[in-house]
């Protein structure tokens, strides 16, 4: 059974609090767009597809409740203005992830078109927004399943020495059910390999400084009983150099893919791509079309979010009381007091280092001149 990180039914939204994982599996209710903004900003939910879905559904939940309590504005124009303002606020929570702004833009278009229809009421606007937001949830799961299947097929055909070999795959950060509406992107590829009986072993990086790999990806791999090993980020080069390990592919997710294929993803991705090229390992990006931003021409145009220094200088873990056996979460300092910290959340991997971009439409590869033509995916 695949982990369910987002629960939504009849206007009620709850998410698993990822800050508590892997020690406590606790769901929190999200009732308003402001609570959605806080959950995204505080990284209680993270992963580009997931934050877009949670943002949309948080506003859908708020509108659903306002509608039940008869507190919706009386005119279609007022409701439309309210939705636009709330969507703009939600986008500000994580600016690097294009899925969030893309979802907001699509929802705004749907609402604007309905508001311009003669005779549209305020409730009509609410209904069309809720329907569209709920549709995004279902579509993301469907798209992720296709991404997983496409990636598994590509690896089997292009990264394995023979048809009889099984894949050894390294992944970074968390790109599974916890980062999406379900199944996952890069981790979905690993799940599909496992389902096809073509996975030998998966490796996941710790993913400092927020430890999404050790806290979240490892949690999902254990949950799904996938054969896997956790390594620290600094062990990747040693892992790739071991003949007995024989890593066939590195598969990562993406927060934004520029028109030329440059990819912004969790900090450390660029370094893995460099290592992959040196060691002759296939390097793949797995992302839905909503992550591809054709308006951004190259990685140099991508805004990179910087996170608080405390995420580097402190770490959270569980402590068991020797007397009672009770487990509680504690945050401790691990760095010298007063040291300066640089903490970019993402880096940009040049398209030259990427062998393929896995989408729900298929796997985009470069032409003979070494260029991606991602616009063709939208034809």
Curated annotation (Swiss-Prot):
GO terms for molecular function: S-methyl-5-thioribose-1-phosphate isomerase activity. It is found in: Cytoplasm; Nucleus. Keywords: Amino-acid biosynthesis, Cytoplasm, Isomerase, Methionine biosynthesis, Nucleus. The keyword Nuclease does not apply. The active site is at 255 (proton donor). It is an enzyme of class 5 (isomerase). Its EC number is 5.3.1.23. The record marks 173 as: Transition state stabilizer. Disulfide bonds: none annotated. It comes from the Eukaryota. Catalyzes the interconversion of methylthioribose-1-phosphate (MTR-1-P) into methylthioribulose-1-phosphate (MTRu-1-P). PANTHER family: METHYLTHIORIBOSE-1-PHOSPHATE ISOMERASE (PTHR43475:SF1). This is Methylthioribose-1-phosphate isomerase. It comes from Emericella nidulans (strain FGSC A4 / ATCC 38163 / CBS 112.46 / NRRL 194 / M139). The gene is mri1.
């Amino acid at each position: 059974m695949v982990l369910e990180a987002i629960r939504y039914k009849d206007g009620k939204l709850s998410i698993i609090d990822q800050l508590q994982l892997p020690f406590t599996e606790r769901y929190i209710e999200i009732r308003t767009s402001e609570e959605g903004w806080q959950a995204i900003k505080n990284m209680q939910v993270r992963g580009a597809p997931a934050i877009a879905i949670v943002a949309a559904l948080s506003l859908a939940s708020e509108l659903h409740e306002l509608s039940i309590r008869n507190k919706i504005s009386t005119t279609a124009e007022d409701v439309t203005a309210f939705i636009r303002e709330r969507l703009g606020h939600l986008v500000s929570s994580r600016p690097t992830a294009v899925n969030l702004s893309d979802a907001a833009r699509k929802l705004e278009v749907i609402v604007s078109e309905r508001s311009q229809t003669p005779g549209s009421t305020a409730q009509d606007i609410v209904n069309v927004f809720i329907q569209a937001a709920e549709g995004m949830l279902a579509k993301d799961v469907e798209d992720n399943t296709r991404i997983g299947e496409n990636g598994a097929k590509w690896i089997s055909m292009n990264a394995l020495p023979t048809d009889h070999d099984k894949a050894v795959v390294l992944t970074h950060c968390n790109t599974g059910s916890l980062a999406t509406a379900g199944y996952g992107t890069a981790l979905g590829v690993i799940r599909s390999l496992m389902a096809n009986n073509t996975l030998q072993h998966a490796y996941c990086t710790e993913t400092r400084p927020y430890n999404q790999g050790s806290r979240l990806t490892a949690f999902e791999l254990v949950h799904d009983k996938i054969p896997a090993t956790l390594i620290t980020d600094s062990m990747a080069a040693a892992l790739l150099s071991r003949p007995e390990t024989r890593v066939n592919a590195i598969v990562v997710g993406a927060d934004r893919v520029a028109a030329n294929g440059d990819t912004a993803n969790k900090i450390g991705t660029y370094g893995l791509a460099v290592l992959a090229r040196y060691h002759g390992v296939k390097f793949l990006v797995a992302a839905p079309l909503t992550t591809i931003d054709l308006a951004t021409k190259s990685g140099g145009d991508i805004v990179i979010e910087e996170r608080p220094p405390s995420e580097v200088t402190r770490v959270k873990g569980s402590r068991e009381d020797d007397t009672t056996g009770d487990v509680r979460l504690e945050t401790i300092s691990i760095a010298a007091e007063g040291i300066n910290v640089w903490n970019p959340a993402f880096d940009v991997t040049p398209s030259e280092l990427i062998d393929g971009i896995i989408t729900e439409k298929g796997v985009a590869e470069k032409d003979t001149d070494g260029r991606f033509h991602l616009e063709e995916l939208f034809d």
